[in-house]
Amino acid sequence: RRVAENTKNLKVFCTYMDTLRPGRGCADILPEGVKDAGAIGVMINHCEKPMSLPQMKLTIDRARELDMLVFACADTLDEAKAIAQLHPDIINPEPSEIIGGGKGASPMAYVMDSIRAIKEVDPSIMVEQAAGITNGQQVYDFIMAGSEAAGAASGIMNAADPIAMIDEMIAATRRAADDLK
């Protein structure tokens, strides 16, 4: 909650929530609790917490009941297309084998194919590319290829100077936005 209350431009997402309703549910993550804690959305289907399509649908429906955004991860193009049919707000199509940095970023052909596949199902879904991003140039290249956002958790945390890497990636995002005008 403190992060959400003390930042102007940072949007807080929960990394998972269950679909239960207030009442019984020991050890479950209550959606209302997630929202009350300051999250505006929920991440679903990360490779470290995979979900079935029916479970994703239930989670998206619960998030919608609470006016929360949904950020979905997809491991393959086929999974990205299937998840797009559930209409989350954002899809991050990232092959799980390259998540965590050090193994290279998503190939540009995959980036472009995944954007196209998702937009063919639902043009309103924002596509974020993230797997394996380790520098600002990759952020710039992915945005110039059509990605609407870029993520880089391990690329930042594993950098020699994480603050400098954040600055580099933000500058690359700004440069791409300016170049696309």
Predicted regions and their residues:
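Catalytic cores of alpha/beta
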Residues: R2-V3, I29, A74-H87, G132-A150
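Glycine/small-residue-rich loop that forms an oxyanion/phosphate-binding "nest" at active or ligand-binding sites
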Residues: K8-A63
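Hydrophobic faces of well-ordered beta-strands that scaffold small-molecule active sites
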Residues: V12-T15, V42-I44, V70-A72, I91-P93, ...
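Glycine-rich beta-to-alpha transition loops that act as phosphate-gripper elements at the mouths
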Residues: T15-A27, P54, A72-L77, M126-Q137
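Glycine-rich phosphate-binding active-site loops on the catalytic face of alpha/beta enzymes
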Residues: I40-M51, I91-K103, A145-I166
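C-terminal helical cap(s) of enzyme catalytic domains, especially alpha/beta-barrels
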Residues: T59-A63, A105-M108, G155-K181
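Active-site rim beta-loop-alpha module in soluble metabolic enzymes
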Residues: L69, C73-D122, E128-Q129, I133
